[in-house]
Amino acid sequence: MAEKKQWHETLHDQFGQYFAVDNVLYHEKTDHQDLIIFENAAFGRVMALDGVVQTTERDEFIYHEMMTHVPLLAHGHAKHVLIIGGGDGAMLREVTRHKNVESITMVEIDAGVVSFCRQYLPNHNAGSYDDPRFKLVIDDGVNFVNQTSQTFDVIISDCTDPIGPGESLFTSAFYEGCKRCLNPGGIFVAQNGVCFLQQEEAIDSHRKLSHYFSDVGFYQAAIPTYYGGIMTFAWATDNDALRHLSTEIIQARFLASGLKCRYYNPAVHTAAFALPQYLQDALASQPS
């Protein structure tokens, strides 16, 4: 039997992960990027950009449930939601499950990403692009949040790692723009990497966000594809009570929402804000 090809991730220099490649569905390598989608028996369809896994069919639900349901249920009455990035459609899919949300705006810098993911990752969006509340804006995220006249109750930054095109979504200009178009009491969240290996990302985001929001922190989830420990999500708001809601309050909102989840539940919600001591110490040691 012929040995299967292997695809090796190149995110870290000293160690990493690999996937056996059952079938390459798409591969484009240009001077600007290397994009591949392949099938793997354990994780289904896998999409990687420039040597870094972006999403897989098998475990994407963990990431997307935690990025959406935590801020939306903590807020309690969000009507207008902004997604920055999210071209694969899975973040949109989870937001559309909240029936009280009235509008969902998604800002994607490349229209081709949306059509590409609709073709190769159809399970991610699961038809959510057809939701009447959804509006797609093709624009740079930093430009949009600093120019739009719209305001939002929850902003979700589904950014890649802070390298290449994704770097702008970790800048002060982006965070300031998000504060500008966030309604009073609103919540901003963003993926912030695996803190054991990418601790400087969390420290940098915490320092920058603290210039614009009075309550800045992180919550976490364990996502197999993003190996090396827990993945952290940045959390920023001016209503510090929202990060400390009881499990009972979240439970009541969860039951009222009618949501059925595979990872998220109210106990996971409240526990997610408990951070390992090494991260707490690193954040506390930074100058104010």
Curated annotation (Swiss-Prot):
Presence of keyword Transferase:
yes
List keywords of the entry alphabetically: Cytoplasm, Polyamine biosynthesis, Spermidine biosynthesis, Transferase
Entry EC number(s): 2.5.1.16
> This protein's superkingdom?
Bacteria
Picking any one GO biological process from the record gives: spermidine biosynthetic process
**Known catalytic reactions:** S-adenosyl 3-(methylsulfanyl)propylamine + putrescine = S-methyl-5'-thioadenosine + spermidine + H(+)
Output one GO MF annotation. spermidine synthase activity
Stored Gene3D superfamilies: Spermidine synthase, tetramerisation domain, Vaccinia Virus protein VP39
Look up the record and report any one GO term of the cellular component aspect: cytosol
In the UniProt entry, which residues are flagged as the active site? 158
Coiled-coil ranges (or none): none
Q: Where is the PABS domain?
A: 9-238
Transferase as a keyword of this entry, yes or no, is yes
One matching Pfam family is Spermine_synth
Q: How does it assemble?
A: Homodimer or homotetramer.
* Stated family: Belongs to the spermidine/spermine synthase family.
What is the designated name of this protein? Answer: Polyamine aminopropyltransferase
